[in-house]
Amino acid sequence: MDTWMYLSQGFAVALTPENLVIALIGCFVGTVVGLLPGLGPINGVAILLPLAFALKLPPESALILLATVYIGCEYGGRISSILLNVPGDAAAIMTALDGYPMAQQGKAGVALSISAVSSFVGSMLAIGGIILFAPALARWSLAFGPAEYFALMVFAIACLGSMMSQNPLKSFMAALIGLGLATVGVDANTGVYRFTFDSVHLSDGVQFIVVVIGLFSVSEILLMLEHTSGGGKLVRTTGRMLFNFKELVHCTGTMLRSSTIGFFVGILPGAGATIASAITYMTEKRLAGLNAKFGEGDIRGVAAPEAANNASACGSFIPMLTLGVPGSGTTAVMMGALTLYNITPGPTMFTEQPDVVWGLIAALLLANVMLLVMNIPMVGLFTRMLSIPLWFLVPAIASVSAVGVYAVHSTTFDLLLMVGLGVFGYLLRKMHFPMSPLILGFVLGEMLEQNLRRALSISNGDTAILWSSGISQTLLVLAIAVITLPPLVRLLRRRKADPLIPDARPEQGA
């Protein structure tokens, strides 16, 4: 009963005219920042943090502003993924796998509308989980140490091969290239320079924005220039801007499953929406069976990652609010905002600052309604981007990409590296290598190495720690199963389809 009393108190905070306006501004700014390639939620929140403090907003209003920008970015990231095949952030990579093919088939409006509803469902279910189970779930998340996170990363990387069932070998090779890129830079433990080729610009490693813009945006520009004429249109959209009832029913189970998985992944500090969207996409692809068209424009391939990454984003508030541990990079920035107001994140917030905590939770509920109402009517406007002539669209994408990359270090080296990676990505795509496993390998590689180092540091180099807990053992067994079972299943199917299997052939010559 206390929970509902506190929630009503939170709505009293969130429904003040000032906080409603702040939430609306945060939703709009977050959507715009999210659709711009390379910025992402962490940059959006970081940009507005000093502004919130400079405006002397009260702590609950400042947190509402930053949280709504965060959620808005998760909504916005899908737009450029679906329309241009350029993910707004890492969490939107999986959305492009089926969203962009749908756009190319003239179904951009359907993809955008179902992704908005999936984002809404994922967020609302996750917020419900925060309201009902936050303290218990926070205690569960503490069971994950470095060894368990290492096993989780191994499982996620093992799953990458299933992203292209037609050629899992190329998926694994792409993931290995991504893992290799993640090792570039100075080793944090030993100070050794790795694969920098005596270039000081590579000492900090290859930045994520440079990789994602190069491999997706620049390579896409090269493909546009190759396959279309200068004045033509990319695709012709259909008149239907919204999904129909049959498509909604088709995606309902996907949304619910993906929201649940995304929520639990989001609770794990540092796991993030990228892992959640990858795991749910591959889970749904396996559940869909051989007749599904994942990677070719399956609507479930859009619904799954969008429900998961929004559920994960909301779930990441649980460790921040209950343990004082950031659930993601963005919530780490938000924790910095709380310290500016002399508020210590953790379990005492629920008793000492109930207006801040429950005002934030209520604002998240309102923000998701705002974002759904804001995004659905704008589907038609977004799809108009597909009718923009290439003589304008290509320079626009190139300019936005270059500005986003240059903003990281303000060096021309990053621009040259972006172009080089773009040409490399173009060649890989011509050879039918998938880009998403490469990017995910790059993102997961750093986390894999960090958690491996931490685990071995705790055990003084004893590798047994990596499989000492039940969680680690379960995840590693699942990783082995993911790698070994698909080839075995294919072999059994071939043997069943071929009546002349080796041990059943009639003897020759008597």
Locations of regions flagged by a protein language model:
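Helix-loop-helix hairpins and the membrane-proximal interhelical loops
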Residues: 1-60, 135, 139-142, 193-298, ...
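Transmembrane alpha-helix interface/packing and boundary motifs in multi-pass membrane proteins
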Residues: 27-41, 72-85, 160-165, 260-269, ...
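Short helix-coil transition sites and intra-membrane helix breaks within transmembrane domains
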Residues: 33-43, 82-93, 125-129, 265-275, ...
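Re-entrant/interfacial helical elements at transmembrane boundaries that shape
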Residues: 41-51, 66, 81-101, 132, ...
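Membrane-interface alpha-helices at helix entry/exit sites of multi-pass transporters
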Residues: 59-64, 101-118, 289-302, 329-332, ...
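A structural-propensity feature for long, helix-poor, extended segments
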Residues: 70-81, 88, 298-323, 327, ...
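Membrane-embedded alpha-helical modules
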Residues: 113-230, 340-493
